[in-house]
Regions:
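N-acyltransferase acceptor-side catalytic subdomain
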Residues: 49
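Alpha-helix initiation/capping motif
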Residues: 1-2, 45
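Short acidic-aromatic low-complexity motifs
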Residues: 2-33
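A beta-strand edge to alpha-helix "cap/lid" segment located at domain peripheries
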Residues: 37-38, 53-113
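A short gly/proline-enriched turn/hairpin at secondary-structure junctions
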Residues: 34-45
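Short, flexible segments with low predicted structural confidence
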Residues: 23-30, 44, 70-71, 78
């Protein structure tokens, strides 16, 4: 099954992720103006590009986060990524990110679980 243009952009971002230029790469994915991200297990929440850059990508930079995309699934307005994550301290964890797209195919909400 083929992915929508936004899901393909998310996939490209995840496959090529590098904490040094994470936000720059992410900014190529279409988003709404006030898109929202919640990562409850990490205690992170942000709304809009500036907060996403400062809070979410600040965390990625501080931890030199590495991501490995193991699968991506699109189901209606949802894009789900299964990831293996690793921090600079060597901590490894599995994560699922769910992206909710609006009617125009832009990312509106992100849950990192």
């Amino acid at each position: 099954m083929s992915l929508s243009p936004t899901a393909e952009a998310i996939k490209h971002y995840k496959v090529t992720f590098n904490w040094k230029n994470g936000f720059e790469s992410w900014s190529k994915v279409p988003t709404t103006e006030n898109y929202h991200m919640l990562a409850p297990n990490l205690g992170l929440e942000a709304t809009g590009a500036d907060e996403i850059r400062d809070i979410i990508f600040g965390f990625c930079t501080e931890n030199e986060l590495q991501q490995e995309l193991t699968d991506i699934i699109e189901h209606g307005q949802y894009v789900t990524c299964m990831l293996n994550l690793k921090t600079k301290s060597g901590e490894s964890l599995q994560c699922v990110e769910v992206f909710l797209l609006d009617d125009e195919g832009r990312v509106d909400k992100i849950w990192a679980l």
